């Protein structure tokens, strides 16, 4: 079981939109140095909707090869086609990924039974730990707690990333899942609350900008050091909120670029962060103690 701060890592790109693999590898080294507990590649924050199939493969393979066992690599392998999700998951296992993150199928709006059959088919086709990803604000389909509990009985399905931000719902899930099934926060603003209720970690956007602090917050929460966990969360709270003033990953790429780690290039239809938000995010970074 993976625990702690798992970064939903950005995908660096050159000004012409090509993948910047040199900076991608440098980011992995940065997160290892900063004590990040795991890396999630080619997820929402990694711009999975706008990388093609070959690039998706390349990013997963590069992450696994460069990490070289120094940090767990969780590959984003979700798709709204079950066959495509299986193919990506097979590739990830063969590439050496430690686990996969599989988002609920988007746009085609399956029923709860359709969701169950989708994830069951992937788990039966590929022997790799799978974390479900529930983000109804993007997918317009919601993995209910009851469906998550059904899926938790399937070998290989080891956890869920809950990006609803609904703490009552997360608490309900934590009380009902088996001990070997992990519940991760997918909402930075409520991550600490979920951790204190028994959550196992966070798959974090904020960790791109403040990786060591996110790791330390998780560590403090697990140790029962509420004062320290709250202190860190207070420092980070504006980042938790302001990194979503426009669609993720627009703001976080701007912030990571200010740190000198990447440039802030995005692929259409995403566009550069509106100038009206530059100062807002700069102040949030300064509040967190990040040099801008």
Curated annotation (Swiss-Prot):
One GO BP: diaminopimelate biosynthetic process
TM region positions: none
Class in the EC hierarchy, top level: lyase
Reactions that this protein is recorded to catalyse: L-aspartate 4-semialdehyde + pyruvate = (2S,4S)-4-hydroxy-2,3,4,5-tetrahydrodipicolinate + H2O + H(+)
Keywords: Amino-acid biosynthesis, Cytoplasm, Diaminopimelate biosynthesis, Lyase, Lysine biosynthesis, Schiff base
InterPro entries the UniProt entry points to: Aldolase_TIM, DapA, DapA-like, Schiff_base-form_aldolases_AS, Schiff_base-form_aldolases_CS
Binding-site positions, pyruvate: 45, 203
CC terms in the record's Gene Ontology section: cytosol
Entry's localization field: Cytoplasm
UniProt keyword NADP present: no
Task of the protein: Catalyzes the condensation of (S)-aspartate-beta-semialdehyde [(S)-ASA] and pyruvate to 4-hydroxy-tetrahydrodipicolinate (HTPA).
Quaternary structure (record): Homotetramer; dimer of dimers.
Name of the featured protein: 4-hydroxy-tetrahydrodipicolinate synthase
Lineage of origin: Bacteria, Pseudomonadati, Pseudomonadota, Betaproteobacteria, Nitrosomonadales
